Amino acid sequence: LLAFALVSEPVFNLAHYEQWTGPALQNVLFTLSLSCLELFVLARIESDAAERGKRIALYVLTCLVFGAAAFAVRSEYVFLGTLSAALFYLLRSAGVWRLAGLLPLLIASPWVLLCAPLLLLYSGERGRRGGKYFFYFFYPAHFLLLQLLGKWIATALA
């Protein structure tokens, strides 16, 4: 996942900043990489820490550490992305309350609400494996296509 984040970064920067290196945010695959690692740590805490108080303290500490890491690498959504991932994980069996994972992302974009119905439909079971890597290749490809389309339109209008 981190390899896809690194490969996608120059094209992401080109699309957002019109240069190969971007001074501001990194692409969302960095957020996803950090979030996956965070969920691994949260799962270990869940299975290893029997005492509820200790588990909660470790959950909070994990969220703070990964939030700081997201801030340090300037991942997209910064600490809000990793916090949302943690909330989705920790509230995964809480029914409609799992939508609380959207709250941090609402600060960044109200469009996040559009995914709420999809989240409510999720059964908790892993989907088909086919096409998994398609989206990792599509992510940088769509930035490149949009950049080329923008250049073509700008040239046509000039």
Regions found by a protein language model. Give the residues of each.
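Alpha-helical transmembrane segments and their immediate juxtamembrane cytosolic regions
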Residues: 1-158
